[in-house]
Amino acid sequence: MKIIVPATSANIGPGFDSVGVAVSKYLTIEVLEERDEWLIEHDLNPRIPKDKRNLLIKVALQLAPNLQPYRLKMTSDIPLARGLGSSSSVIVAGIELANQLGKLDLTDDEKLDWANKIEGHPDNVAPAIFGNLVISSVFKGAVSSVRADFPECSFIAYVPKYELKTRDSRSVLPFKFSYKEAVAASSIANVAIAALLQGDLVKAGRAIESDRFHERFRQKLVREFPNIKKLAKKHGAYATYLSGAGPTIMILAPKDRAKLIQTRIEGCKYNGEVFILDVDRDGVRVEF
C-alpha cells in the first residue's frame, strides 16, 4: 500500500491561515511488512527520526493507539521548512495511515478535523486532503471548508536554499489591526477568492498582490522577493506571493509564460531552485 500526499501552497496573498492549494510535489509512504517496532526508512534530513518518534507515527497513534507496527518507506520531493506544507503532508499521511491500518473509515471532513487539531490551522492540511483550492475557517473549534477548482495556470516556485521557520516568520506579524485596517484587508481577500472562483486570474492577481495581512511584514525575511516579483510581472505573471510562511516565492502565470519566467529567475543566479508546478486536483490518495 502507498499513501501519496501533495505539497501545498497556503495563504495565496490575503487568504491568511485560510486559503491553500495543492501542488505537484509529493510525500509517499509505502507500507511494507509487519514488525515488532516501527521502522521508517528514508534518505531525507538526518534529523528526521526513523522510529516511533517520527511525526508520521506520532500522528497515526493519536488516532489509533494500538496500531500494529510496520516497516515503512518514506520518500518526498517536498522541500523541508520552505513554505510548501512539508509538515502538513506528514500529518495528513499519518492520519491516512491510521485510517487504513486501523480501518477507521474516516470521511474527508473527519480527516480535516483531526488534521486541524494537530496542525493548529487548516490552510495547508485542507488542500492536502481534498486537493485543488480549499478555503477554510475555524470558529469555536469547528472547521468549515469549501473546495473549488483553481483556474488553469502554472505555478512557478522559487525555493531558496535557506530555511525560514514558521515561528520566526510569525514573529514579525503585528498583534492587532485597527477596525479600518481589518475591513480593508478582508475586503481584498474577498475579491481575491471571488475572482479565483470566477476564473479571473488578472483580477485575482491584483488582489493577491494587495494583501494587507502578512506579506508586507514578512517580505524583509525573503531578500529575493522584490526582484523576483518585478521580474515575474515584466514577463506576464498574474501574481507573486510568499507561499505559506515562506521563504518559497510562488508565481502564478499563464502556462505559455512559465518556462520563460523560470529561465529568467534562474539567470539571476540566486541560491535556490526554480520549479514549474501544476495544481494537484486529487489530494491524498491510496494505492494498493
Curated annotation (Swiss-Prot):
EC number: 2.7.1.39
Presence of the UniProt keyword Transmembrane helix in the record: no
PROSITE patterns: GHMP_KINASES_ATP
Transferase listed as a keyword: yes
Catalysed reactions, semicolon-separated: L-homoserine + ATP = O-phospho-L-homoserine + ADP + H(+)
InterPro entries per UniProt: GHMP_kinase_C_dom, GHMP_kinase_C_sf, GHMP_kinase_N_dom, GHMP_knse_ATP-bd_CS, Homoserine_kinase, Ribosomal_Su5_D2-typ_SF, Ribsml_uS5_D2-typ_fold_subgr
Main location: cytoplasm
Protein's GO biological process: threonine biosynthetic process
GO CC annotation: cytoplasm
Chain residues that bind ATP: P79, L80, A81, R82, G83, L84, G85, S86, S87, S88, S89
Annotated compartments: Cytoplasm
Any one GO molecular function term: ATP binding
Pfam family for this entry, one: GHMP_kinases_C
Alphabetical UniProt keywords: Amino-acid biosynthesis, ATP-binding, Cytoplasm, Kinase, Nucleotide-binding, Threonine biosynthesis, Transferase
Function, in words: Catalyzes the ATP-dependent phosphorylation of L-homoserine to L-homoserine phosphate.
Family: Belongs to the GHMP kinase family. Homoserine kinase subfamily.
HAMAP family cross-referenced by the UniProt entry: Homoser_kinase (MF_00384)
Record-given protein name: Homoserine kinase
Gene: thrB
